[in-house]
UniProtKB/Swiss-Prot annotation:
Subcellular localization, as worded in the UniProt entry: Cytoplasm
GO MF, one example: exodeoxyribonuclease VII activity
Pfam families referenced in this protein's UniProt entry, alphabetically: Exonuc_VII_S
Example of a GO cellular component annotation carried by this entry: cytosol
Function field: Bidirectionally degrades single-stranded DNA into large acid-insoluble oligonucleotides, which are then degraded further into small acid-soluble oligonucleotides.
Keywords attached to this entry: Cytoplasm, Exonuclease, Hydrolase, Nuclease
Name of this chain's protein: Exodeoxyribonuclease 7 small subunit
The species this protein was found in: Chlamydia trachomatis serovar L2 (strain ATCC VR-902B / DSM 19102 / 434/Bu)
Known EC number: 3.1.11.6
HAMAP family membership: Exonuc_7_S
Gene Ontology biological process: DNA catabolic process
Amino acid sequence: MTKKAKNVEKVPFEDAMKRLEEIIDLMNQPTTSLEASLALYEEADQLMRICESRIQEVEARIKQLSDQRSES
């Protein structure tokens, strides 16, 4: 895993979402080059995977807590 990828994994969920919005804005600018767009796309892909993983972790934890409450 690259250094950049490791740094992306440490980004808080809210910051990752904010960065994804920034990437969308940058990619929609006509001055963004093809190469820059590709790099932004790759960064966005990493951020989306991390966000999806964190959402799944939270959903699993909520289900676990709900199940525990139901058993009580």
